Amino acid sequence: MISDESDRFNPRDPKPADAGKPSKSAKRREARQLATQALYQWHMARQSLNEIEAQFRVDNDFTDVDGAYFREILHGVPQFKTEIDNALTPCLDLAIEELDPVELAVLRLSTWELLKRVDVPYRVVINEGIELAKVFGSTDGHKFVNGVLDKLAPRLREAEVKAFKR
C-alpha cells in the first residue's frame, strides 16, 4: 500500500487553537453524567440542591464540564418534577416509585430536556439518555430507557419527530 505524504504527522504543523479542548457536546455530556449522579443523590438522600451542587463542584474537576448546564439540569429537574413525572407516567409499565432510582434519574433528566430544552434535538436527548443508562444503569437499563424515551418523544415533540420521520 502506498502511503500519502499528506496523511503523515508533521510536528512542525501548527495545531488549531482549540486542539485538545473538548467540544460543546462533550462538555454537555460530562454535565449530564454529573447531573445524573447528583439527581440520584437528591432522590435518595433528599439533600438540598445547593449542598449537592457545592459538593459536586468540590469533588469533581469541572474543567471539561459545561458547569452552567449541570446547574440548569440539577435545579431544573426538581423544579419541574411534577410536570416531568406526569409526562413520563403514560409511557411507563411501572409506577414511578417502582423504577430503579438510577434509571429514574436518567429518565427525569431526559424528560426535562425534551420539555424545557427544545434547542437540543430529540434524537440527541434519546441518545444521551441511552448512553447515561449504559454508564450508570443496570445491565439492560439502557433498553428500558430507550423504550420509554421512544414513546415519550413523539408526545412532547410531535412536530419535530414527524418532520424527522418524513
UniProtKB/Swiss-Prot annotation:
GO molecular function: RNA binding
Keyword Aminoacyl-tRNA synthetase assigned: no
UniProt GO cellular component terms: cytosol
Biased composition (Basic and acidic residues): 1-18
Pfam families (UniProt xref): NusB
Keyword Transcription regulation: yes
InterPro entries named in the record: NusB-like_sf (IPR035926), NusB_fam (IPR011605), NusB_RsmB_TIM44 (IPR006027)
Residue span of region Disordered: 1-30
Keywords per UniProt: RNA-binding, Transcription, Transcription antitermination, Transcription regulation
GO BP of this protein: DNA-templated transcription termination; transcription antitermination
Family per similarity comment: Belongs to the NusB family.
Protein role: Involved in transcription antitermination. Required for transcription of ribosomal RNA (rRNA) genes. Binds specifically to the boxA antiterminator sequence of the ribosomal RNA (rrn) operons.
Protein's name in the database: Transcription antitermination protein NusB
Organism (species): Pseudomonas fluorescens (strain Pf0-1)
Source taxonomy: Bacteria, Pseudomonadati, Pseudomonadota, Gammaproteobacteria, Pseudomonadales
